[in-house]
C-alpha cells in the first residue's frame, strides 16, 4: 500500500441554495457551506491525517473549502495547487439559470438528460465524459504520482469533477456513475496500492443527503 488520496466536494454555495446551475461561475459558500467544510475538516482531524499537499480548482468555493479543512488540521500554510482542470462541469447555456426555469424552457426530460446522461452535454457546455477528459489526465500526471510516492494528498473540488474520478477509482460503469451523488463537505479517503488501484475507501460522514 502506498499513499492516501482524500476527495472532498466543496460546501454548499449560494447558488446551490438558490437551485441554480453553477458550473464555472464563482459564487461564495453559504454559512451552511462553511459549517460543512468545518465538519469535513474536523472529521479528517479525528481520522488522524496530515496532508503533504493539497489540490483544488480555480473556483473560490472549492478553494475556501480547502482552506477551511486545512485550518482545522493546523495546516493553513500547506502548499496548495489551484488548477481549472479540477473545475466543475461547465453547464454552458444553463449556467446561472434556475433549474425549474430551465425545465420550463427546454422541458423536464431534456434537462434531465443534460444533467444525468454520461455523454450528452447541454448547449455550449460539457457532459460528464467531457469533464472526465480534462480531470483524469490531470490526476494521472499531477496527483497520482504523489500518492504513489507515499504522500497524503487532499483534493477539494466539485460534484462532477470528483464523480469523474470516483467513476474510475471505484470501477463504475457509465450507467452506475449516473446514480452516484456526492454530499458537500464529506471526505472520501482512498488508500491506493502500488499499481494505483484502490486498497480501501472510507467515507467520513453521511452521503445520504447528497444531491
Curated annotation (Swiss-Prot):
Swiss-Prot/TrEMBL site (Transition state stabilizer) positions: 158
Gene Ontology MF: a single term: phosphoglycerate mutase activity
Active site: residue positions: 10, 88
Signal sequence, renumbered to the chain: none
Pathway in which the depicted protein is active: Carbohydrate degradation; glycolysis; pyruvate from D-glyceraldehyde 3-phosphate: step 3/5
EC class name: isomerase
Catalysed reaction, written as an equation: (2R)-2-phosphoglycerate = (2R)-3-phosphoglycerate
Highest taxon of the lineage: Bacteria
Keywords: Gluconeogenesis, Glycolysis, Isomerase
InterPro entries listed in its UniProt record: His_Pase_superF_clade-1, His_PPase_superfam, PG/BPGM_mutase_AS, Phosphogly_mut1
GO terms classed as biological process: gluconeogenesis; glycolytic process
Subunit relationships: Homodimer.
PANTHER family cross-referenced by the UniProt entry: PHOSPHOGLYCERATE MUTASE
Family: Belongs to the phosphoglycerate mutase family. BPG-dependent PGAM subfamily.
UniProt name for this protein: 2,3-bisphosphoglycerate-dependent phosphoglycerate mutase
Gene: gpmA
